[in-house]
Amino acid sequence: MCQLLGMNCNTPTDIVFSFEGFRRRAGLTDSHSDGFGIAFFEGKGVRIFRDNQAGHSSPIADCVKQYHIKSFNVIAHIRKATQGEVTIENTHPFIREIWGENWVFAHNGNLTSFPDMSESFCQPIGSTDSEAAFCYMAEQLKNRFRKKPTEEQIFQVIQEITKELTQGGTFNFILSNGEWMIAHCSTNLHYITRKAPFGTAQRIDDDGVIDFRQHTTEKDKVTIITTFPLTKDEIWTKMEHGGFVFFKDGDKVYEVLGTPKETIDDGTLGNAKAA
């Protein structure tokens, strides 16, 4: 299946350190090489880069590395296709308008059954289960609320819609409107919140090292969400199966617990450590 990466923080931050480890899993330390994408929220807009080439060798991914774009919310995805051809339109993250806002979504999993959206107002452009599920989510939200509801209401309804969709299979996802970020875990999803006092970190996939003290202030809070941990010397929290977390400004605001289960390594961590 695919892998996810998200960042939510209280100050504009670049995601290059995490992204560089993450993209190595797109064909070097792991086999998620059927395309990559990354979306940066900038005010009300979204700067999105996608390629159907493997993320580790994509010139577009190289551009992202060199650009050092800073954002409050970022979502990235590396694809290992289960449904749909390896094309740009099937590459995550996906974006839709909801209540006059850009919403961005990326999914890891496989839905063997999902709603038919062929006659809906919000229709998929590609042929993935992921985009169809996002379109269903967007349409359900708009049907239930004519105007934008509270964040707590959004979080509650996302849970209800997700429970419908998970009946069709595995549905890990990260979702953001540029103000907050919601993560749901079906199998594997981990997060870490970095805040003062900051220290150093070493990547699992290539031993890259960073000293966060050189790039932060005492007020900064940065939460990273990913399928599997990206660093070897930090403590990551594994989300519970069926759990939801709502992040804003780098803080965990709401959480719904699921069933605690240990990380099931699909080969990613073993391959990364051996690389």
Residue ranges and their predicted role:
Residues 1-59, 74, 201, 242-244, ...:
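Extreme N-terminus nucleophile/cap motif
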Residues 2, 103-113, 247:
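Conserved beta-strand-loop-short alpha-helix elements that form
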Residues 52-64, 78-101, 117-120:
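Short acidic (Asp/Glu) patches
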Residues 43-47, 101-102, 113-122:
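Cytosolic regulatory regions built on CNB/CRP/Popeye-like sensor folds
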Residues 200-244:
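A conserved acidic, glycine/proline-rich C-terminal tail/linker
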Residues 126-129, 187-210:
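Gly/Ser/Thr-rich active-site loops/lids in small-molecule metabolic enzymes
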Residues 113-115, 119-144:
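Glycine-rich phosphate-binding loop plus the immediately following alpha-helix
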Residues 147-187:
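Catalytic core of PPM/PP2C metal-dependent serine/threonine phosphatase domains
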